From Swiss-Prot:
PROSITE patterns, A to Z: CYCLINS (PS00292)
GO molecular function list: cyclin-dependent protein serine/threonine kinase regulator activity; transcription corepressor activity
Post-translational modification: Phosphorylation at Thr-282 by MAP kinases is required for ubiquitination and degradation by the DCX(AMBRA1) complex. Ubiquitinated by the DCX(AMBRA1) complex during the transition from G1 to S cell phase, leading to its degradation. The DCX(AMBRA1) complex represents the major regulator of CCND1 stability during the G1/S transition.
Role of this protein: Regulatory component of the cyclin D1-CDK4 (DC) complex that phosphorylates and inhibits members of the retinoblastoma (RB) protein family including RB1 and regulates the cell-cycle during G(1)/S transition. Phosphorylation of RB1 allows dissociation of the transcription factor E2F from the RB/E2F complex and the subsequent transcription of E2F target genes which are responsible for the progression through the G(1) phase. Hypophosphorylates RB1 in early G(1) phase. Cyclin D-CDK4 complexes are major integrators of various mitogenenic and antimitogenic signals.
Location of Phosphothreonine modifications: T282
Main location, first listed in the record: nucleus
Species assigned in the record: Danio rerio
Designated name of the protein: G1/S-specific cyclin-D1
Amino acid sequence: MEHQLFCCEVDTIRRAYQDSNLLNDRVLQTMLKAEENYLPSPNYFKCVQKEIVPKMRKIVATWMLEVCEEQKCEEEVFPLAMNYLDRFLSVEPTKKTRLQLLGATCMFLASKMKETVPLTAEKLCIYTDNSVRPGELLQMELLALNKLKWDLASVTPHDFIEHFLAKLPIHQSSKQILRKHAQTFVALCATDVNFIASPPSMIAAGSVAAAVQGLYLKSTDSCLSSQNLTNFLSQVIRSDPDCLRSCQEQIESLLESSLRQAQQHISTETKRVEEDVDLSCTPTDVRDINI
């Protein structure tokens, strides 16, 4: 029998065990103090930018999210990239023709911060249909670093999610799906301009509360009822319960509108495909042709 070599190596990323010391209250309080230093200006569209409007930000944010999803980036990459983008736009007037270049640059930086194998400049340029050259991306990277004052360790909503999950009376089997739902809400909030001024801790708490509400986990424990959960999380982040409740409602409303738009897009595409099939399957009678 011939000797055969079996390669058992895989491309899975090696991860360290979760350190419980990173989930203590001292770390949480430090993040709550630090998050204010990384908040972008909520009115930069009026005060700083002359060409860029909220609709353009929405378009480039959706594109950035699609790139991150297709490249299977870490969950933290997209919100961090959007934080860089908003902070840059808060201080530097930018032409609308350079907005996609800025978005690609922010993903480039965030990927370096959070990925074991970061995105390359060449790959990001491909996603711009080669409208951006690698050299331009690297030049923009230096400009972005300068405007961000080389402070890239932004506090994002993802940093708070694990702290909240560790404090909630949730079975371990439910934590994974709850975490995934909360991360999805965080990414959704990052695409919407209405959450630019919201602190990361508020977005994270609202996302966790909305996830618990959506998964009906509140029925398993009285502590997870809507009012009790809101009061508890507001105490953790030192916020007013009404503000947190309003944030949660905004997130739920954003989810509904996003799902509605997605369904409309799917139905439109389906109708278009059906029309194309009908046209291709129905031969034209020569007598109907007006020569």
